[in-house]
From Swiss-Prot:
Pfam families, alphabetized: DUF711
Domain of life of the organism encoding this protein: Bacteria
Subunit field text: Homodimer.
Gene3D superfamilies per the UniProt record, alphabetical: 3.20.70.20
CDD domains in the record: RNR_PFL_like_DUF711
Protein's UniProt name: UPF0210 protein Teth514_2074
Similarity field: Belongs to the UPF0210 family.
Source organism per UniProt: Thermoanaerobacter sp. (strain X514)
Length: 455
C-alpha cells in the first residue's frame, strides 16, 4: 500500500501535536481452571497462570510502540470475575490473599493495572459474592494495581437494590482506608449496570464468562485529534458537517488501534478480541471531551445544549469507528471522567457543570458518572442513591452505565484533590443534601422494565 506524503505528515501530527495514542492493550485471561478448594492453591494457580500468559505482553507492546511510533500508554490485564472462582474463600483474609496474588502477578509482568476483582450480583448474592464485596475496601487499600467492579443491574434483571445499598457503604469505607491518598482506593472501584465482558478500560475491566481462553482487547484515545479537526471548521459549519468530520477522524483513530491490536494478538499467539472505540481524555490541555463540545459552539461544557452536543459526538465516533474494525466492543463511545479531563475540571470550577448535568449527559454517552470527587462526609445512603439513579438510566436505555465516585475524606465542596497520573485532579463537587435514606433502606429488586412500550 502506498501512502501520500500528506497522509504520513497527518499521522505524525496526530501523534506529536494532537496526542493520538493507544490508551490500552488489555489481555483478558480465563481463570476458571484455577479453581481449588484450598485458597493457597487457588492463589498460586492464579499467579502462575497470569505470569505465564502475560509474560511477553509489555515487551510486545513496547516493540509495537517503537515500530509504529504510536504511544501505547497502558498495558493491562483483565481476569475472570474472582467471585466466580473463589467460593472456597471463607473470610476477608482469604480474599486478601487472592487480591495480593493478582497484585503480585501484575507487578511481575509489569502491567499498570489488573481488573477482575469483581462480582456479578444483578439478581442476587451468593455467599462468595458477599464475602468478596465486603473484602473490597481492604483489598484495594492493600494493593497497588488491583481494580474492582460490581455489576448490580441489567436491563433484563432489573436493579439489585440490596447491592446498591451495600456498595454505598463499600465505597465510603474504601475511600476512608486510603484517606492518606485522598481516598484513591475508590478510584479503583466501579459499580455497573449492563457491564460488558470485553471492556479493556479500568477500573471496570473483567474477562467475561463468554470469552475465550485468552484475548487481546484494545482501547484507543484521540480527543485531541478530533478537537484539532473541528477547530478547522468555521462557525457557519452545520451539524451535518461536524458529524462528518468526526466520523472521518474517528475512523483514522480506530484504524490505528485495529492494526496494533491484531499485531499484538499475533505476536502473543492469542486471539484478537475487540477494539473499544471510546474517546478517553487525559488531564493534558487539549486532550479533552469538554473542549470538543465547546468547539461545537458551547461557551462552557455544562451549558444548555451540552447533552445534545455529546449525543452528536458519541454517535459520530461510533459511526466512523465501526468502519475501521470487524470486532467493535467494550464501552465504545465518549468518556466524561471529571478528574481526567482538563475541560471538565474547568467547567466544574466555573460553576457550569454539576453532578445533575453529568447525570443527564450519561444518558447519551459511553458510560456514566466517572472520577467525581465529592465531600468526604457524604452519607453512604446518598452515594447509593446516586448509584441507583445511574443504574436506572442504563437499565431503561439498554446501555452500559457506571459510577466511579470518590468521597474524599476530610474534604468539602470547593476543595481540590490530586490523584496523579492519568487519574488527574479534581474539584470536590456539590452533592444534593436532601436525604434518600428511607428509599435506599427498602431493599429488594427494582423489576426489569417492559421493553415493548419504549416511551
Amino acid at each position: 500500500m502506498r501512502f501520500a506524503f500528506d497522509e504520513i505528515e497527518e499521522t505524525i501530527r496526530m501523534v506529536q501535536a494532537e496526542k493520538l495514542d493507544i490508551r490500552t492493550i488489555t489481555m483478558g485471561i480465563n481463570l476458571r481452571d484455577c479453581v481449588s478448594d484450598n485458597v493457597e492453591t487457588l492463589s498460586n494457580k492464579i499467579y502462575d497462570k497470569i505470569t505465564k500468559k502475560a509474560k511477553n505482553l509489555v515487551k510486545v507492546a513496547n516493540d509495537l510502540e517503537s515500530e509504529f511510533g504510536i504511544p501505547i500508554v497502558n498495558k493491562r490485564i483483565s481476569v475472570t470475575p474472582i467471585a466466580l472462582i473463589s467460593e472456597s474463600a471463607k473470610s476477608t483474609e482469604d480474599f486478601i490473599k487472592i487480591a495480593k496474588a493478582l497484585d503480585a502477578a501484575a507487578k511481575e509482568v509489569g502491567v499498570n493495572f489488573i481488573g477482575g476483582y469483581s462480582a456479578l450480583v444483578h439478581k442476587g448474592f451468593t455467599d462468595g459474592d458477599l464475602r468478596l464485596i465486603n473484602s473490597i475496601p481492604e483489598a484495594l487499600s492493600s494493593t497497588e494495581r488491583v481494580c474492582s467492579s460490581i455489576n448490580v443491574a441489567t436491563t433484563k434483571a432489573g436493579i439489585n437494590m440490596d447491592a446498591v445499598a451495600l456498595m454505598g457503604k463499600i465505597i465510603k469505607k474504601t475511600a476512608e482506608l486510603t484517606k492518606d491518598k485522598d481516598g484513591i482506593g475508590a478510584a479503583k472501584l466501579v459499580v455497573f449496570c449492563n457491564a460488558p465482558g470485553d471492556n479493556p478500560f479500568m477500573a471496570g475491566a473483567f474477562h467475561g464468562v463468554g470469552e475465550g481462553e485468552c484475548v487481546i482487547n484494545v482501547g484507543v484515545s484521540g480527543p485531541g485529534v478530533i478537537l484539532a479537526a473541528l477547530s478547522k471548521l468555521d462557525n457557519k459549519a452545520d451539524f451535518g458537517q461536524i458529524s462528518e468530520i468526526i466520523k472521518k477522524t474517528s475512523f483514522k483513530i480506530a484504524r490505528a488501534g485495529e492494526l496494533i491490536g491484531r499485531l499484538a494478538a499475533e505476536r502473543l499467539n492469542t486471539s484478537f478480541g475487540i477494539l473499544d472505540l471510546s474517546l478517553a481524555p487525559t488531564p493534558e490541555i487539549g486532550d479533552s471531551i469538554a473542549n470538543i463540545l465547546e468547539a461545537m459552539g458551547l461557551s462552557k461544557c455544562g451549558a444548555p445544549g451540552t447533552t445534545a452536543a455529546l449525543a452528536l459526538l458519541n454517535d459520530a465516533v461510533k459511526k466512523g469507528g465501526v468502519m475501521a474494525s470487524s470486532y467493535v466492543g467494550g464501552l465504545s463511545g465518549a468518556f466524561i471522567p471529571v478528574s481526567e479531563d482538563a475541560g471538565m475540571i474547568s467547567a466544574v470550577e466555573a460553576g457550569a457543570l454539576s453532578i445533575e448535568k453529568l447525570e443527564a449527559m450519561t444518558c447519551v454517552c459511553s458510560v456514566g458518572l466517572d472520577m467525581i470527587a465529592i465531600p468526604g462526609d457524604t452519607p453512604a445512603e446518598t452515594i447509593s442513591a446516586i448509584i441507583a439513579d445511574e443504574m436506572a438510566i442504563g437499565m431503561i436505555n439498554k446501555k452500559t452505565t457506571a459510577v466511579r465516585i470518590i468521597p474524599v475524606p476530610g474534604k468539602k465542596e470547593g476543595d481540590h484533590v490530586e490523584f496523579g497520573g492519568l487519574l488527574g485532579h479534581a474539584p470536590v463537587m456539590k452533592v444534593n443534601n436532601f436525604s434518600a435514606d428511607t428509599f435506599i433502606k427498602r431493599g429488594g429488586r427494582i423489576p426489569a422494565p417492559l421493553q415493548s412500550l419504549n416511551n
